[in-house]
Amino acid sequence: MVISKQYHQEIEDFVFNLVHKYEDQQRDEQEKTHFSLKPQPSSVVLEEDYKTASSNSVKKIKEAFSVVGSVLYFTNFCLDKLGQPILNENPQLTEGWEIPKYQQVFSQILSLDGQEIQVKPKRPKSHCFNCGSEEHQIKDCPKPRNAARISEKRKEFMEAYGEASNQNFQQRYHAEEVEERFGKFKPGVISGELQDALGVTAKSLPPFIYRMRQLGYPPGWLKEAEMEHSGLALYDGKDDNETEDEGYLQPKHVTYDVSKLINYPGFNISTPSGIPDEWQIFGSIPMQPSQQKDVFAHYLSNFHAPSSKSSNKRTAPQPSSHHSKRPKDDLEVAVADMDIDSDVEVSQRSQTTNSFQFQPPLPPGPPVISTPPPLPQGTPPLTPRSLTPTQPSTPTHPPLPNTVSSLNPSSDVSQPKIVDSTMDEDTLTLEELEEQQRLIWAALEQAESTNSDSDIPVDTPLTGNSVTSSPSRNEVDVVAEVRSDKMVTLETKFSSISEQVPENEHSLTSPNPDNSSLNLKEIPDNSDSEGLLDNTVPAPNHEVNDGESIVDNKVVTSTESSAKNSNPVPDMSKFAVGIAPFEFENMTESTGTYLRIRSVLKNSPRNQQKKKT
């Protein structure tokens, strides 16, 4: 013990020197060192029993089924990129996998020298104004309420919340402030900071200049140069219809202020001296003469395009100036196009306006007046009014091209009509054709009204004999269809017959002597309507004497019989089957109800109250 205490320092120095000597020796003799670390599972052979396999098979399996890890082995050390092996697959239990945690030393942002950083105040959290706890609100506070404390805390909270809200959300931006903030940025001028950011120097053009040559002038800055208009029009009160119409119908035009065009060196103005034009390197195009500032300004000064902001809701398909420049003849034709609504009149107008077309002559003789079918039994007798139909009042100013001889309604044989058509169709005007059409419709309507008055007596009831008297109404439809067929027959004869047939004289007699009264009724009406029908169709110069051919009589008679058979409307007697007449005499049981309940109404509470008052 005495020796150890006496030589303690020497023994310690000897051991220290010995260890130091050993370390120096190991460092000098690197080839004699060996790596004694335990092997890590960086490469695992996926084989159940690899010991029993041969060496070749083990080598193949190791090459094909080996999981290579991230451990890199060196001479003196190994490097694992993923860290040390995980102990029980838990990084918390493995040394070296702990994530270091550092304490926060600074609570404020560090500022540079001579600068002050303004820290925005935090928005206060909602808490209980009574006890100050953030876990619940004042309505859930278990402590007794202190009104003074609640009022004070609420006031402090609202003040703090208002300051934070004013700084964050209730800040207004004005155009002047924006201009001051971005006033240092000017279009077309590249600052030194922007050159550093783009990686260009003052002796070279920026890359976007070459791209602008392909895309053109920036549309955003072109919009800035656009001049706004109020859209208000001022009229001086003078009767200048042409100027007013042109000013009202013309769309708004966009004008530009050429003084606001921006200079871009290398794009719309010449490149400064000493700066090369490297458009080939950037795959662009050289400067275009059309993109020069003076050329573009001249184009914008003469540019007149409709603005997208124009709110002209009333648009006309054609300006009124076009109508004023039309000749008078064109205006008359346009009016005729709108007024004409008949196929016959349209065909006549087209023939007169385009060119002269040959019209074949009419067949000899007037249109045949066929005998209508006999009326069924039970038809009431004819009234004297049907024998003398009144003629419609016709104006005298439009001259009629044809003259019709009057017929004698008292005879059974109809007198043939003598038609003198000496007027060409080109001489007829639109007004004359319209007047003739109006006369035809008036005659047809009067004939139908006359037939309806004669067929249905005034005192005939609708019940009982309505079935037997109904066919007389249907006769009017047959007569109207026969007249329409006659009109079609006349038009067909115009285009089909081109030869003049010798004139013959025949008298039209009734084939059935029992229907003399019916002929007396139909002949005056048909003569009137057919006479007007002859006036509607203009024909070339020809003469038609009283007479007709047997062939024409057969054709018209067959047409009328087919029109009668092809009537799609059934007889009115079929509609009355199973229909009981409704007469007011059957409603006697429902009358007198109010008289029976009037006594009950007198005793109602409302009437009793009225009597008391």
Curated annotation (Swiss-Prot):
> Pro residues compositional bias: what residue ranges?
360-383
Which residue intervals are annotated with compositional bias (Low complexity) in the record? 384-394
Q: Which SMART domains match?
A: PSP, ZnF_C2HC
One GO cellular component from the entry? nucleoplasm
Gene name in the database record: ZCCHC8
The name under which this protein is listed is Zinc finger CCHC domain-containing protein 8
InterPro entries membership: NEXT_complex_subunit_ZCCHC8, PSP_pro-rich, Znf_CCHC, Znf_CCHC_sf
GO biological process terms on file = mRNA 3'-end processing; RNA processing
